[in-house]
UniProtKB/Swiss-Prot annotation:
Catalytic activity: RX + glutathione = an S-substituted glutathione + a halide anion + H(+)
Enzyme Commission number(s) of this protein: 2.5.1.18
Protein family (similarity comment): Belongs to the GST superfamily. Sigma family.
Species per Swiss-Prot/TrEMBL record: Caenorhabditis elegans
GO terms under biological process: glutathione metabolic process; innate immune response
Function as written in the Swiss-Prot or TrEMBL entry: Conjugation of reduced glutathione to a wide number of exogenous and endogenous hydrophobic electrophiles. May play a role in the detoxification of reactive oxygen species produced during pathogenic bacterial infection.
Residues the record lists as binding glutathione: 8, 39, 43, 51-53, 65-66
Single GO MF annotation: glutathione transferase activity
UniProt keywords, alphabetically: Transferase
InterPro entries: Glutathione-S-Trfase_C-like, Glutathione-S-Trfase_C_sf, Glutathione_S-Trfase, Glutathione_S-Trfase_N, GST_C, GST_superfamily, Thioredoxin-like_sf
Name of the protein this chain belongs to: Probable glutathione S-transferase 5
Lineage, opening ranks: Eukaryota, Metazoa, Ecdysozoa, Nematoda, Chromadorea
A Pfam short name: GST_C_3
């Protein structure tokens, strides 16, 4: 029997999509949550392959980088698309999501108190342009699939990632008036029984 251990901070962040993959698959794993106080010592021991979180251990073997972990788990549990083309489309969306996250990072860091800058100025100048561009792309994918999922006619891991991000934005008062399709998408994905149960029972964290 394969043993899985996911190590990440006690927050959703970059570890959440992997947790939701496990939840959807009904797969047992160790959800190892590291506090900010514990992290320096863990980092010093080089337990994390690249000196950062999250990382996944599979029968003791370590895999780092959140999207690499998600792609691996998605393949294991059939959430990577039904064909090679669908998998490539999922990966293209994931890469674009990373680009968007990089563009918007100064705003998110300021909101969380981890970075400098005026939140409202960063929202206007950095976040909103990045958000509207990326979510415009997502609308195109939803329209092309016609299924309510971003790629193909079934759930993939990128649905989980985008739905969680949308839900986080909505919970903080994000304006989805221009993107009702993505609000509906988040509601659809997070109403899937396994995901709904996970959301209801997971630890409550600010991010």
């Amino acid at each position: 029997m394969v043993s899985y251990k996911l190590t990440y901070f006690n927050g959703r962040g970059a570890g959440e999509v992997s947790r939701q993959i496990f939840a959807y698959a009904g797969q047992q794993y160790e959800d190892n949550r590291v506090t900010q106080e514990q992290w320096p010592a863990l980092k010093e021991t080089c337990a994390a392959p690249f000196g950062q979180l999250p990382f996944l251990e599979v029968d003791g073997k370590k895999l780092a980088q959140s999207h690499a972990i998600a792609r691996f788990l998605a393949r294991e549990f059939k959430l990577n698309g039904k064909t090679a083309w669908e998998e490539a489309q999922v990966n293209s969306l994931a890469d674009q999501y990373k680009d968007y996250s990089s563009e918007a990072r100064p705003y998110f860091y300021a909101v969380m108190g981890f970075g400098p800058g005026d939140v409202e100025t960063l929202k206007k100048d950095i976040f909103l342009p990045a958000f509207e561009k990326f979510y415009g792309f997502l609308v195109n994918f939803l329209k092309a699939s016609g299924s309510g999922f971003l790629v193909g006619d079934s759930l993939t891991w990128i649905d989980l990632a985008i739905a969680q991000h949308s839900a986080d934005l909505i919970a903080k008062g994000g304006d989805f008036s221009k993107f009702p399709e993505l609000k509906a998408h988040a509601e659809k994905i997070q109403a899937i029984p396994q995901i709904k149960k996970w959301i209801e029972t997971r630890p409550v964290t600010p991010f």
